[in-house]
Structures are given as C-alpha cells and as structure tokens.
Amino acid sequence: MRICLVLEGSYPYVHGGVSTWMHAYIQAMPQQEFSLWVIGAKAQDRGKFVYELPPNVKEVEEVFLDDALRLHGERQPVLFTADERTALRELVRLGSPDWDVLYRLFQEKGVHPLSFLQSRDFMELFKDICLQEYPYVAYADAFHTMRSMLLPVLYLLTGRVPKADVYHAISTGYGGLLACMGGSLNHAPVLLTEHGIYTREREEEIIRAEWVVPSFKSRWIRFFYMLSEEIYRRAFRVSSLFYNARRTQIEMGCNAEKCIVIPNGVQYERFCNIPLKQEDGWVDIGAVVRLAPIKDVKTMIYAFFEIGRAHV
C-alpha cells in the first residue's frame, strides 16, 4: 500500500514535535510505502532536509508557495461552464465551493491560475465584493489582498498529484486541500490528524499580524475556515491529541462521528522512579513548554503568579 503524507512547513525540513512524530510514524510501518507531499514557504529550501528519509519513503513531491509569485504568461481566454462559474464564485466569496469541480478544472482542463485571475469573470466578482463589503477601502488594497489570497490556492491546484492508496493530511489549510484533491482525483480515502488546530492558529496569527490590512483580517480568517471545511467534510477519520481539540473540530463543522482522540503517550519506565518532592506545605506546579508565540507561555506565567498570590 502507498500512503501519501501531506505536510506543511514541518517534516522533513525542520525538527519539532510534528516532524519527530512523522519520522517515527514512517519507521513504525516498514512494510508500507510512503510518498511525502510537502509544502514549504520558499523554494530556496528545496531538498534541504534535516532528516535522513527512511528507505520506505519512495517519493517526495515538494511544492513551494513563493513559486506562485513567479507565475507568468499571457492570459488565455477560458470559457467556463455554469458549474465551474458557480464553484469559482463560491471560492472568491469564501463560501462553500464545489471543490471537485475546481480540482477537475485546474487538473484535467489545465486552466492556468492567471487565466482566471485576469478574466472578466474574476473582475466582475471582485467588483461586486468591493461594492458590497469594502466600499470605503482603496481599490488597490482590495485587489492585491484578493490576489495574494487566491493565487497560492490556484497554484497548488495545478501541481502534480502523487498517486497513492490513501492520503493522510497532518493539518487542514493548504495541506488538507492537497490531500482532498489527491483523494478526489484518485478515488482514494482521506484522513486527517491535527497535531494542533491549524485554523485557530492561523486566526491568532492574523489577528496579531501587522501586514494584514485591518479591513481584511476577517476575510483572511474566513479563507482558512473555508479550507478546513473541505477536509472536515471529505476525511473519513479526523483525529486530535486531546478532547478540547476534538470539541473545537466539531464546533468548526466536522461530523462528531468522525472525530477521535489519540493522546500523546509517555514511556512510563523513564519517569516512574523520579523521587517525590519533600513536603514543605507548598504545591509546586511545573511545565514543560516550547517557547513559541502560539504556546502563549507569558499568559501561563501570569496565571501561575495569580494562583500563587491568591494562596499566600
């Protein structure tokens, strides 16, 4: 069996929790073949792996989002069908597009991303959105925001699709979308394992981001929610690490019957002989954390302080 792992910004380029897990996951099933379909931010990272890939990794398909910025070519007129036009309209409006129609449009029909983004259909949709949602925002800001939002997605939809018997996405977002496209085109099952809730992480980043025009922050957030809806709908199984994450997935629209929790385990033998603290009347609370903005360690420290002050 060939398993295609779809990853974004992690294995095999960087060390970390997801990467460590992925490496162990592949090594634990030497009888299975794996393809890696990996999304990176910059093409300059091509081939710069920090892991020695196990021998059962048979293929690595690398895709880099900044390559979308280098797309060029003259606009080729395209005559869209009614279904294609409806799906594209829903995509631009960040609604509920028929992704199967879009997969076929950009894969089988071979439509170039710029052929749509420079088409009359797109400009009419864009004009309507500006009039309805952003009447007081500069036209240039609106245009470049919309283009930068859609171009990477359309670029990903035109890329090569590795063949596999099952597609396993390790996040929603761009990676989840590629897994769904692979499953759709090759009639293969799709499953999702979320190490963290990708959409919520992007939402927090967007809220804090200075590069996002304030008027468009809600639109960027809607964009990532739209992507997550596709894999929550298509995946036959959705797993997370803890029950609050499962609850969040369900709140975001995933069918509860699909959602399971597989907690991280520990090797009990490594920790069972740690001596207990000598009794001194205090309750000591420790934390093993990674220093990263998404972990919000600062709030944890404040919480420890407030708890300690309340009980002095």
Model-predicted segments: where are they?
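Active-site proximal beta-strand in glycosyltransferases
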Residues: 3, 166, 183-210, 239
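Nucleotide-sugar-dependent glycosyltransferase donor-binding/catalytic pocket residues
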Residues: 14, 267, 290-293, 308
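Conserved donor-binding/catalytic core segment of Leloir-type glycosyltransferases
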Residues: 275-305
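An amphipathic, basic-hydrophobic alpha-helix
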Residues: 142-166, 176-178, 226
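Short N-terminal targeting/anchoring amphipathic segment
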Residues: 95, 101, 158-176, 185-191, ...
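N-terminal subdomain of nucleotide-sugar transferases
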Residues: 1-130
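Carbohydrate-associated surface elements
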Residues: 244, 265
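Membrane-proximal helix-turn-helix segments that form the acceptor-binding/catalytic region
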Residues: 153-163, 184-185, 197-198, 215-238
